[in-house]
């Protein structure tokens, strides 16, 4: 029978000092036999996805206390990728994931907490907390802040839906008037919550649901809706049950590694492919799997991508649907239900509610459930009122979207495409793979060949695009922006956005060892591995080299002979200590980022730290 970890600091005469300090936090004698549960919050006023979380930790804590636990809250950092985008701040985004994971480990292990409730929401916060949870392997429940309502405005006498990416595109489009650009900017992000499309934050919150670590509805229920409060209340109650099951009944099924098994990871990736999620999710799932000591690799993702169809299409791949529409169609479990009927899921998995996948679908899949309360929950909709308050409205759609032929979520028979929304490509400068969000690629450019225009920084590429130096048919190559080379693996949302602004969104390709925002669409290929700074062949590409992209056949090729590639690699090595570094780039890199770069692996490993360098 496992002992409560917290007993280390609450029992025994030699722990008198620790107990004295616990008493100073408000604990009493009656608390010293109870489980201590960490409420891991991520409130910040910097990030709209987290601005409403201040009081939600207290909400969870009250339920923990009422259920017989002791709640202790702490906060992590949270970087807003949208605000950090397009300048040096983006160098810090991905490294913040490791800091978040480490800070959770530090706090939980230093104070011997028994379990956790993780209150996350945005891009690197959910992955960081997920990595920590699987590293620590103590009972955990995730409950996120929820998606933002889609923006809406009237243009040309028509009400249209908007999101952050629309504001960026129109802001850079010289054909758009200042008045219209300002109107879109003011309308794009109307409420608190994670940005309203299937960007990285919402993708990851959907995946925690598929992994079984969060409750039904977590990925899609709006931040502003009153129904979301129940997820927080239930999380506080349920975590105490899970904790007691493990420590008092020796039931290891309550542990995250037994819930988020390899089968669950495969289900999560299957969901991601089917819903056309952010390419960043690949990076984060690979990293989380390593923390869980699960053998889940790019090869597994490649196999899944070849058999899973696209059953859901959401912004940025279309402006017709946002997360509020996904929720109306049944949310994550609506998509999982269709995948299950198609025979594409592992059914022998459980979630934090203790339900198997078939049991969960029977209760929560809107296409089969008989539970009116569940149907009501999935009719929760937007209010269209600007606010930063959680649970501030109770609007509902009159009906569910259960049209699986032409609705937001489709059945296998009516799939958006037989190929899923993500694909892994391999070739002679991506030997370990690269990722493309096929959901956002126009059918006309699934096969594309063109001359390379090579840039050694995102800034240089942006200047070239806006300066008219990139033309129709070009393949823009941005290198030395990987985890090690950046360092920090910047998101390339600005280059892809500006290609659209210049009318080149369907006329050019962009390839990088960096990564893309969940808001990216178009022929944007990232995570090229090995990266340039690790000796990858992306470093030897020159202007004018022809590059062939073949998404249907999962190929990407630099059209050079093996002999020429070998000669260029030899020339690169001849640069000595300057080999595999950018030639002309000037970039100030802080000590903190240099420390990150010294251990960073390429994207095919999830950009995690190389344990072998630490003797681990």
Swiss-Prot record:
[2Fe-2S] cluster binds at residues 122, 195. Pfam families: ILV_EDD_C, ILVD_EDD_N. It is an enzyme of class 4 (lyase). Pathway: Amino-acid biosynthesis; L-isoleucine biosynthesis; L-isoleucine from 2-oxobutanoate: step 3/4; Amino-acid biosynthesis; L-valine biosynthesis; L-valine from pyruvate: step 3/4. GO terms for molecular function: 2 iron, 2 sulfur cluster binding; dihydroxy-acid dehydratase activity; magnesium ion binding. Mg(2+) binds at residues 81, 123-124, 491. The active site is at 517 (proton acceptor). Its cofactor is [2Fe-2S] cluster; Mg(2+). The keyword Ribosomal protein does not apply. Keywords: 2Fe-2S, Amino-acid biosynthesis, Branched-chain amino acid biosynthesis, Iron, Iron-sulfur, Lyase, Magnesium, Metal-binding. GO terms for biological process: isoleucine biosynthetic process; L-valine biosynthetic process. Its EC number is 4.2.1.9. It catalyses: (2R)-2,3-dihydroxy-3-methylbutanoate = 3-methyl-2-oxobutanoate + H2O; (2R,3R)-2,3-dihydroxy-3-methylpentanoate = (S)-3-methyl-2-oxopentanoate + H2O. One of its GO terms (cellular component) is cytosol. Binds 1 [2Fe-2S] cluster per subunit. This cluster acts as a Lewis acid cofactor. SUPFAM superfamilies: IlvD/EDD N-terminal domain-like, LeuD/IlvD-like. The modification N6-carboxylysine is found at residue 124. Functions in the biosynthesis of branched-chain amino acids. Catalyzes the dehydration of (2R,3R)-2,3-dihydroxy-3-methylpentanoate (2,3-dihydroxy-3-methylvalerate) into 2-oxo-3-methylpentanoate (2-oxo-3-methylvalerate) and of (2R)-2,3-dihydroxy-3-methylbutanoate (2,3-dihydroxyisovalerate) into 2-oxo-3-methylbutanoate (2-oxoisovalerate), the penultimate precursor to L-isoleucine and L-valine, respectively. Belongs to the IlvD/Edd family. Homodimer. This is Dihydroxy-acid dehydratase. It comes from Klebsiella pneumoniae (strain 342). The lineage of its organism: Bacteria, Pseudomonadati, Pseudomonadota, Gammaproteobacteria, Enterobacterales.
